[in-house]
Design a protein with these regions (language model features):
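Surface-exposed assembly/interface segments
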Residues: 1-233
Length: 233
């Protein structure tokens, strides 16, 4: 894991951990939050909380058209706090690749994967970048933090080595910065995304879809009891 610089309110905890790691190679970290903390999302109106992977697995079915809730943005910051407001996610299919600002991050344009082609599907591939739009994470505005190449909009997609290549699953299992919550609202022009590959022509929008994350809020100061709860986990 990577940790930022100590703040006035968190200096004691930060420096205690830093000192411990000078003579130890491993440390358990618990992030205790108050109800004030919110994850940044690509929605301008709805904020939410996703505490960790276990919590995500519990609540992810509540997002998207199938649940009736498309108000939460398609992209959600992986952790609560204002730092997530520095993030931007972009997703691009074949039609928009030539004019995409981030095409140089990838070897070639996305298209139709071998998996989808073998099943009569088309245009399932997309490229995704996660960008430090404001420079608050990396220290440099516009730094590309993560790239996901040739991932598929098909829910059953497999890569050549047999591993899961469904874009949402790839992002949610390996990104350090964002969750991909659903394909509705923000990403609705990527039609049929999230369905099986067989016979499916996936949406191929003419330009990359860019979404900045907002609404992230830091935790309020912890009480002694809340700190103790963290130690009990």
């Amino acid at each position: 894991e990577k940790f930022g610089s100590p703040t006035i309110t968190g200096a004691v905890d930060f420096l205690s951990a830093a000192q411990f790691l000078r003579y130890s190679s491993a440390m358990f970290v618990v992030r205790e939050l108050t109800s004030a903390a919110k994850n940044a999302t690509s929605s301008s109106t709805v904020v939410t909380n996703v505490n960790n992977k276990d919590h995500w697995d519990e609540i992810k079915s509540a997002f998207g058209a199938d649940s009736g809730d498309t108000n939460v943005g398609a992209w959600i910051g992986k952790w609560a706090g204002a730092l997530g407001n520095s993030l931007k996610a972009e997703i691009c299919t074949a039609a928009g690749f030539a004019a995409w600002a981030y095409k140089g991050e990838f070897d070639a344009a996305p298209g139709t994967s071998a998996y989808a082609s073998a099943r009569g599907g088309s245009n399932d591939e997309c490229h995704i970048v996660v960008v430090d739009e404001d420079g608050e994470i990396s220290g440099t505005v516009g730094t590309v933090l993560e790239r996901f190449a040739f991932v598929s909009m098909a829910s059953d997609a497999k890569a050549a080595d047999g591993t899961n290549n469904y874009a949402a699953d790839v992002v949610n299992s390996s990104s350090e910065y964002v969750w991909l919550a659903h394909w509705d609202g923000d990403l609705s022009t990527m039609s049929n995304a999230g369905t099986a590959a067989s016979g499916t022509a996936f949406g191929n929008p003419s330009a990359a879809i860019t979404k900045s994350l907002t609404g992230g809020v830091d935790s309020a100061a912890l009480t002694t009891a809340e700190v103790a709860t963290g130690f009990d986990l």
